[in-house]
């Protein structure tokens, strides 16, 4: 299965590429911006998008929800430094296709989140669960 990396930080992309390369049956592809993401999802929407929402060119929760409706087989792993509680609540309440992982989480939690998303299950990291 293909994992799309939608993160502007080179070091984060390099780390994710490395971690995912060690996981069987998965491959990564980097998307540079929203236009590139849309083109790639049109080719194959049955994928996982690891998205740093705070650094990518998606404006708000509404826009992300529209993308979720447009590509219903895509799983979204929001992987960011800081996400507002209200933002996360909106997404979690709207669709089971959204998962949440903070960049401060452990490597074990990162791998678990990716496995959950690949299996079409929702994942919310422990830290975010405590806040919600």
Regions found by a protein language model. Give the residues of each.
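Conserved active-site segment of CheY-like receiver
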Residues: 8, 79-83, 103-105
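Short, flexible helix-to-coil linker/hinge segments that flank and couple to helix-turn-helix
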Residues: 88-92, 97-132
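Conserved acidic segment of CheY-like receiver
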Residues: 1-11, 16
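Acidic, metal-coordinating helix/loop segments flanking the phosphotransfer/catalytic sites
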Residues: 32-48
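Conserved phosphotransfer cores of two-component systems
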Residues: 42-44, 67-73
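Conserved phosphotransfer microenvironments
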Residues: 48-67, 80-87
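Short hydrophobic/Thr-rich beta-strand motif most characteristic of the beta2 strand and flanking loop
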Residues: 25-33
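Two-component signal transduction core modules
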Residues: 49, 76, 99-101
